[in-house]
């Protein structure tokens, strides 16, 4: 029964209501100024859905209740958005040597990002707030969560 539920989660999070849908909207809106709410939508579907799938499937397989799975999903959404905003920041503040991929690619491709909408400092504050939200949500779950807290902090404060 758990495996079937996990397959459903994976199908939903990777399909048109998840990563594929987010990528489609992202491509369709290239070269257009995207308002923040639409950018949030794209990021939540692309990066957020990927993390939600991984984390919720893990919770299901560990025997979490439906309520706990919903909590994990909210936490993963916050982590995913923070991760993507950090990616936007690194695209303009890092180097190709550090990142291992070309920098300023969003600007070259005329893509709207948190940095282009809000500036680097506000984007950094958004990352911090979202990671704090994720950690707060984490500690509403049962069990020892120190490792997961450290993992969240590493994911959203990474330099590559």
Predicted feature locations:
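All-alpha prenyltransferase/terpene-synthase fold signal
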Residues: 1-160
């Amino acid at each position: 029964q758990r495996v079937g539920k996990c397959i459903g989660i994976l199908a939903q999070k990777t399909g048109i209501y998840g990563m594929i849908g987010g990528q489609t909207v992202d491509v369709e809106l290239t070269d257009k100024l995207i308002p923040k709410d639409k950018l949030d939508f794209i990021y939540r579907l692309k990066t957020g859905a990927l993390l939600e799938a991984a984390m919720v499937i893990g919770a299901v397989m560990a025997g979490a209740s439906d309520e706990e799975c919903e909590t994990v999903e909210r936490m993963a959404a916050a982590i995913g958005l923070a991760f993507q905003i950090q990616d936007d920041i690194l695209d303009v503040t890092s180097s190709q040597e550090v990142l291992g991929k070309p920098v300023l690619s969003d600007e070259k491709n005329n893509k709207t990002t948190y940095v282009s909408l809000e500036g680097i400092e506000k984007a950094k504050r958004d990352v911090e707030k979202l990671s704090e939200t994720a950690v707060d949500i984490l500690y509403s779950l049962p069990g020892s969560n120190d490792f997961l807290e450290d993992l969240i902090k590493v994911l959203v404060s990474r330099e590559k």
